[in-house]
Amino acid sequence: MIQGISVGQQDHPAAGPAAWLAALGAAMAVAMALLMPGAAAAEGRLVAHLSSKAQADPPKGAEGLCRRYDWACARGSSARLTAEQIRMADKLNRRINASVRPVTDLAQYGREEHWALPTARGGDCEDIALLKKAELIRMGIAPDRLLLAEVLDRQRNNHAVLILRKDDGDYVLDNLTNRMLPWSQTPYTFLRMQDSSAPHRWKAVFAGGLFRG
C-alpha cells in the first residue's frame, strides 16, 4: 500500500520548494518502481482509461467518506452510458460549477481537509466533485462509472475531480472548467483514484502531467 501521496496543499498555496521537491521525489520513486516495462510508452500513446498501479491510502480528509455517504463508495453494474446521460453529465458539470461558491474547508470546518457535500455557504473542489457524483448517481449513472480522483494542478497543488468512465475513455468533471475533457487532455498529474471494482478503496495512478515522458 502506498501512503502519503499528496505533495501539495489542496486549494491552498503550494508548500515550500524544498519540501515539495522532496515529497515529489519520493512519490516518483515509488511510481517508477511500480510501473511495468513499457508503461511510459503506453502513457505516450495516451491510454484512454486511467489504470491503477497499487493500493493507496485515501486522500487526507477522505478517511471517513464511506461512513458519511454510503453512495460515495457504492458498487455499480457498469451499465452502458447512453448519449442522453453523457449530455446530462456535461450539463450538470456546468450547472454545479456555476452554483456552488468556493469556500475552503478551513473556513467551514476549521481544518485543512474535510470531504463533504457543499453547504449553503459553498464548498471546495472535493465537495463539488462529491455533489456531482451524488447527482449523477441519482440520474441513473452506475456508481462504478463515477470515480473520485486526486490530482496535482499546474501549480502542483492537490486538487480533486470526478472521473466519468465512458466506454471510449475517462473524462474529467472539474470545478475549474466547464469543459468535460478526456483525462489525457487536462494539465493534471493524476495521483490516485477510487477503485472501480471496490470504491471504498483507493488506487495509485501516477499518470499525466509530471509523469508524461
Give the ranges of each region predicted by the language model.
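A structural boundary/capping signal
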Residues: 2-4, 39-213
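Bacterial N-terminal signal peptides
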Residues: 22-35
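Short hydrophobic "helix-edge" motifs at membrane interfaces and signal-peptide entry regions
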Residues: 18, 27, 59-61
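N-terminal secretory signal peptides that target proteins for export/translocation
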Residues: 1-17
